[in-house]
Amino acid sequence: MNKGTSFTSSIDNTTYQFVTNQDLTISPQDGVYKFSNVNLYEGTLVTFRYTVDSTDVDQKFVIPSVNADTSTLKVTVQNSSTDTTLNTYTLASGLRSLDNTSKAYFLQETDTGKFQVYFGDDVIGKKLSDGNIVILEYIVTNKADSNGASSFTLSSSVGGFTDVSITTNSNAQGGAEPETKESIRFNAPLQYTSQDRAVTTT
């Protein structure tokens, strides 16, 4: 089952799209293909690309949609337009474990409510090179609107098959509105205080 395989579900006469967020492979048992515990994410899978331009000192790698689910974000860097080698970058969870070879990215919210991806400086995290292509893959959602969806229909195909039986283990949940500015103002000083240290000042 390919990443981005789509399903639909309806709530109050409104149809929502759900997609898979990873490739899944199984072997048939007695001629039957059965995927278990498949996670579906409400929304549309989107891919956005930036080409690194070292002459643009103000270049930023912004996720264009304010409704992007950053928990689904996958960041890869292609060497160049002629070298299609891909390197996966992971979200930095702290600074102490990073060095100049760490393929890590950082994430911050802009004043427009969109998120910006940025990278290391060859001291803390590996620095990007001119001509690198930054590939941002993520799901754009309808936030909390699809919570409660319980019946799903395959709207694409799986390995060429369209006659698929689906059993729902749990209803859709977890969709939420973005964090409010008031909440950000309250939490940001607390996060800044820790700064990845074991001891904070008081």
PLM regions: where:
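Signature of Asx- and small-polar-rich beta-strand/turn repeats characteristic
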Residues: 1-202
